[in-house]
From Swiss-Prot:
One of its GO terms (cellular component) is cytoplasm. This is Imidazolonepropionase. Keywords: Cytoplasm, Histidine metabolism, Hydrolase, Iron, Metal-binding, Zinc. Pathway: Amino-acid degradation; L-histidine degradation into L-glutamate; N-formimidoyl-L-glutamate from L-histidine: step 3/3. N-formimidoyl-L-glutamate binds at Y142, N316, G318. It comes from Methylobacterium sp. (strain 4-46). It comes from the Bacteria. GO terms for molecular function: imidazolonepropionase activity; iron ion binding; zinc ion binding. GO terms for biological process: L-histidine catabolic process to glutamate and formamide; L-histidine catabolic process to glutamate and formate. Zn(2+) binds at H70, H72, H239, D314. 4-imidazolone-5-propanoate binds at R79, Y142, H175, Q242, T319. Belongs to the metallo-dependent hydrolases superfamily. HutI family. Its main location: cytoplasm. Coiled coil: none annotated.
């Protein structure tokens, strides 16, 4: 059988659906043609391949390319000065009254050109790519006007044109109130009738997100956004139950959301609802760490009910200025007490599920895109165990 490229003498963590554990294969082989996997499994069971190029992996481990399924890569400015103020004892409320917080990022994002947004986001994206990331989700949400949200989503699309990476875009117009609009209901009406339909028509968004929280939008307001997304034919995601239990997990499940993210305050009913709906719980330990949260997501409840769990950086300027998915692996284990298997599945198979792309990425299985990360480690657990260490040997996207 003819193939473009063959990786031999490799150890595989396939993460395949239904495989025990990480789907480990000690003497493995991967064959690819036209960017897709033809075979991934034991060398002894492989068909006879005639390869244009053969790569000897010398016993290295291969995993699926890593996936960061929750980021806010596109934004103007930073919030380093606020970080210093917080260290000096200033509260979030004091910072906000002084013109800081998310409003400061909105102003900086609106003031930046689309080219400038692309340039700054590429620096953050490059840090992720250097750790084996082959797919990333990018949200808008710092423009909060049709023009600025359009620019943010266009910038996100351009990231995938500028780098060899799969980019999924998410419209997050219901992120916060813009500084010029004091009325939440009126703003949500604008999101639903003007912003979302326009950006959906232009094909700029692959999904729609919202922030359901006391400091953001109510469950009823969030439901209006999700109804508008449904009318536009777009799947939904939700920032849910991060700071309080507003029933966000159950709301996400009711709308069949791809994912519900954060979830520190989710309850058992919410965990069960997520499992029934097939909605992935995306856990974000970077934000938990950075803003010194003390309440962990209810991981034991997710396990009990069979809720799928993913991990992501939540890279954003205010609460998680983090561009290391490898560090997130360690944080997931140490802060949230996930197992090695849960962590690695959380940045591959379950992250793909959270983006609605499991049919094409996230595991090493025939028919999927040949997105690989090759690692200089003795065992996959090292990827979770080590901190501040990047053992990536090679990153392959679509067989190249």
């Amino acid at each position: 059988m003819l193939c473009d490229r063959l990786w031999r003498n490799a150890r595989l963590a396939t993460l395949a659906e239904g495989a025990p554990g990480l789907g480990l294969v000690e003497d493995g082989l991967i064959a690819a043609r036209d960017g897709r996997i033809l075979y991934a499994g034991p060398a002894r069971a492989a068909p006879a391949f005639a390869a244009r190029e053969t790569v000897d992996c010398e016993g290295r481990w291969i995993t699926p390319g890593l996936i960061d399924c929750h980021t806010h890569l596109v934004h103007g400015g930073d919030r380093a000065a606020e970080f210093e103020a917080r260290l000096a004892g200033a509260s979030y409320e004091e910072i906000a009254r002084a013109g800081g917080g998310i409003v400061s990022t909105v102003r900086a994002t609106r003031a930046a050109s689309e080219d400038a947004l692309v340039g700054s986001a590429l620096r953050r994206l490059d840090a992720l790519i250097a750790e084996g990331v082959t797919a990333v989700e990018v949200k808008s949400g710092y423009g909060l006007s049709v023009a600025s949200e359009r620019a943010s989503l266009r910038a996100a699309r351009r990231l995938g044109e500028s780098r060899d990476v799969t980019v999924t875009t998410t419209f997050l117009g219901a992120h916060a109130l813009p500084p010029e609009e004091p009325d939440k209901d009126r703003y949500i009406a604008h999101v639903c009738t003007e912003m979302l339909p326009a950006l959906a028509r232009e094909g700029l968004a692959d999904a729609v997100d919202a922030f359901c929280e006391g400091i953001a939008f109510s469950p009823a307001q969030t439901a209006r956004v999700f109804e508008a997304a449904r009318a536009a034919g777009l799947p939904v995601k939700l920032h849910a139950d991060q700071l309080s239990d507003l029933g966000g997990a159950a709301l996400a499940a009711r709308f069949g959301a791809l994912s519900a993210d954060h979830l520190e305050y989710a309850d058992e009913a919410g965990a069960a609802a997520l499992a029934r709906a097939g909605t992935v719980a995306v856990l974000l330990p970077g934000a938990f760490y950075f803003i010194r949260e003390t309440r962990r997501p209810p991981v034991d409840l997710f396990r009990r009910h069979g809720t799928r769990m993913a991990l992501a950086t939540d890279c954003n300027p205010g609460t998680s200025p983090l561009t290391s998915l490898l560090l997130v692996l360690n944080m997931g284990a140490t802060l949230f007490r996930l197992t090695v298997e849960e962590c690695l599945a959380g940045v591959t198979r379950e992250a793909a599920r959270a983006l609605g792309r499991l049919h094409e990425i996230g595991t090493l299985e025939a028919g999927k895109w040949c997105d690989l990360a090759v690692w200089d480690v003795e065992r996959p657990a090292e990827l979770v165990y080590r901190m501040g260490f990047n053992p990536l040997h090679a990153r392959i996207r679509r067989g190249r």
